Amino acid sequence: MESLIEARGLRLRYGSKTVLDGLDFHVPKGRVVGLLGHNGAGKTTLMKVLVGLLQAEGELKVLGLEPRRQRVQLLESLAYIPDVAVLPRWATPAQLITLMSGLQPRFSAERARKLLQRTSVSLNDKIKTLSKGMVAQLHLALVAAIDARLLVLDEPTLGLDVLSRKAFYEMLIDEWCDGERSVLISTHQVEEIESLLSDVLMLNEGKLVLAIPLTDIDNRFSALGHDAAAADAVAAAHPLLRYRVQGGSAALFEGQPPPELAALGQRLRPSLVDLFLALTRQPEINRSQGL
């Protein structure tokens, strides 16, 4: 399968601090990939490397191009919304559509207007009068109207309420994902986007601790729900993570639980949140409370 991103040994340092530490991964076409990590894990830095804003050591091809050296050519087929994306407050959506038509040869003004019809944003509204959720939907409509092959989103729903986040992701899936184009989304709101993803990349302190299609999670990891009587036996098996669930406790293992534990509990499907907590070395939590 064709890869839209190929990275080998990506490394970036700021002075004595290693921000990206030898990352190896690829993103095939037609995928929705979650780039997950806590604040400071290196997500934004990696995205800036992918779009050519920063130079890293190692080998990197995005859409077959070298991002730093061929950035102008790359941005013809790549759309990017950074975490600090700002639209001019004085402008209207109609003015931004006109501006984009002159700047981006692959931009379709007709498609942008069509996408905005599914939102509550009017073409003649001033940006300064729009809510955060409306601005996010406008921004997505503008980039989704570009005939690009790869969409890179850095914390696109940060600061939005639940309804606005839901509307944003529904629009993303409906209007962008077509089996050929790919999306890379960075977030620490793991539970919220799990159902949207086909693949996941997990960063922890600049290291890639997991790169996996979601369909492979059940083959590599397992969870065991158990009661208090089995707690000591489960702990002795050194699970990746122990956590509380409604009605008892659970433990996450790489591979299958030891055979001697099978009769002590119930097999559970590990969630992406559980893996995230286990692989980014977070302490025990009550899963009912979320992250």
Locate the predicted segments by residue:
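Helix-to-loop junction immediately C-terminal to a conserved catalytic motif
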Residues: V51
